[in-house]
Amino acid sequence: MTKKVWKFYGIALLAVVIDQVLKLWVYFNMQMGTLGQIKLLGNWFKLFYTLNPGMAFGIQFGFTYDKVLLTIIRIIATSMIIKYIWNLAKETNSSKWLLWGWSLILGGAAGNGIDSIFYGKILHNAPYGAPMSWFYGQVIDMLYIDLWSGRLPDWVPWYSGYYVTCLPVFNLADVAILAGVALIVLDKRASIQQPVQKYEATEVTDSELLETRHELVDPITEHNNTEHNHPEVEDK
């Protein structure tokens, strides 16, 4: 069992290592913004170095100490996932895809958590005005699918003139989290379909058994009816 658990912890660790290697490469080799972008697939897919002070895909809570709360949530969530994988791996009939999914989520959460906890101090990328360097690191994002970007027209309420992109810039940790969620959803759908198939198979089996029972009962009934129609004549 221990070997099985560490196998999936190893998957999470591999996701963290790959994520951190790419982030550090971007940090030391790329210029932030449009001037430093690297086109990988024409104008559609690029490496675009940017910093994200919030959660995955740039989501933020929007108050002064949201970064501290976010980091605490990441630490708690990571600890809970570690424990959950341990318990799940101990089950003899645990799904491999479910373990893969949670391992990828663990790797993604830990990868972005490292940025939040350490990068503000080590890479000095904490936002201006942050009360401390620790726990205020900004997550390094670099993967950009450029489907559309531009400024919203003036007639758009509340957000007129804002520069927006169709998809936010993300990183490999975000990809790992999304892939993990997808595997869990697929596993759940498969587990829902299996009982239905099993029930249908049981219905067929019960039907066959009922038919067999009728075949066994009918000769007995016919024999009883014959005796009833032709009673024995008593000797006088």
UniProtKB/Swiss-Prot annotation:
MF term (GO), any: aspartic-type endopeptidase activity
Catalytic reactions on record: Release of signal peptides from bacterial membrane prolipoproteins. Hydrolyzes -Xaa-Yaa-Zaa-|-(S,diacylglyceryl)Cys-, in which Xaa is hydrophobic (preferably Leu), and Yaa (Ala or Ser) and Zaa (Gly or Ala) have small, neutral side chains
Keyword set, alphabetical order: Aspartyl protease, Cell inner membrane, Cell membrane, Hydrolase, Membrane, Protease, Transmembrane, Transmembrane helix
Main location: membrane
GO cellular component: plasma membrane
Function comment: This protein specifically catalyzes the removal of signal peptides from prolipoproteins.
Enzyme class: hydrolase
Underlying gene: lspA
Entry keyword annotation includes DNA-binding: no
Membrane topology: Multi-pass membrane protein
Pfam families registered for this protein in UniProt: Peptidase_A8
Disulphide bridges, residue numbers: none
HAMAP family on file: LspA (MF_00161)
Ranges that cross the membrane: 8-28, 44-64, 68-88, 98-118, 166-186
GO BP term, pick one: proteolysis
Pathway terms, separated by semicolons: Protein modification; lipoprotein biosynthesis (signal peptide cleavage)
Entry protein name: Lipoprotein signal peptidase
Organism of this sequence: Amoebophilus asiaticus (strain 5a2)
UniProt subcellular location: Cell inner membrane
Active site annotation, chain numbering: D141, D174
Entry similarity comment: Belongs to the peptidase A8 family.
EC code: 3.4.23.36
